[in-house]
From Swiss-Prot:
It comes from the Eukaryota. Transmembrane segments: none annotated. GO terms for molecular function: phosphatidic acid transfer activity. InterPro entries: PRELI/MSF1_dom (IPR006797), Slowmo/Ups (IPR037365). Residues 1-187 form the PRELI/MSF1 domain. This is PRELI domain-containing protein 2. It comes from Homo sapiens. One of its GO terms (cellular component) is mitochondrial intermembrane space. GO terms for biological process: phospholipid transport.
Length: 189
């Protein structure tokens, strides 16, 4: 089955400022769930100018304790007990392609933890707004699907959907705050 969350936001700041703020967004005291972000790889294609980055984020496990306990007692294959969600942190991998010439950045993220039971993927784009070239449009689609935990698949997907929506809104608020702090008031129409 799976659940999807779509986000669309226009930042009234130039593309370069928005991307710079995005790349410095975490860790941040406004979102204590993101513990650290580390650049694993960064390279520039000299012919196109595209900058590729791979980052790993370490985040707190936000699955409620009641769901962790329920799932930790599941018996899977050979009657072996597994602790599916009893981990303190999760890892996310983010890849981005920044094209300064065309003023766009594509981002793909996925979860490296729980891959046997869950698939979490996000695709995002920052691009110059068609409405105003001094503004930046942000479009994101996130998808989570849970398998292998029976009737709890739906419960976990519902929780994940709510968490994704709230996280997206929190991310937008953090970006707006950072942009205002670093760049001043938004640009007028």
């Amino acid at each position: 089955m799976g659940v999807s969350v779509d986000v669309h936001q226009v930042y009234k700041y130039p593309f370069e400022q928005v991307v710079a703020s995005f790349l410095r967004k975490y860790p941040n005291p406004m979102d204590k769930n993101v513990i650290s972000v580390k650049i694993m790889e960064e390279k520039r294609d000299e012919s196109t100018g595209v900058i590729y980055r791979k980052r790993i984020a370490i985040c707190q496990n936000v699955v409620p304790e009641i769901l962790r306990k329920s799932l930790s007692t599941l018996v899977i294959l050979c009657w072996k007990k597994v602790s599916i969600l009893k981990v303190p942190n999760i890892q996310l991998e983010e890849e981005s392609w920044l094209n300064p010439r065309e003023r766009n950045m594509a981002i793909r993220s996925h979860c490296l933890t729980w891959t046997q039971y869950a698939s979490m993927k996000e695709e995002s784009v920052f691009r110059e707004s068609m409405e105003n070239p001094n503004w930046t449009e942000f479009i994101q689609r996130g998808r989570i699907s849970i398998t292998g935990v029976g009737f709890l698949n739906c419960v976990l997907e519902t929780f994940a959907s709510t968490f994704l929506r709230q996280g997206a809104q929190k991310g937008i608020r953090i970006m707006e705050m950072l942009l205002k702090e670093q760049c001043g008031a938004p640009l007028a129409e």
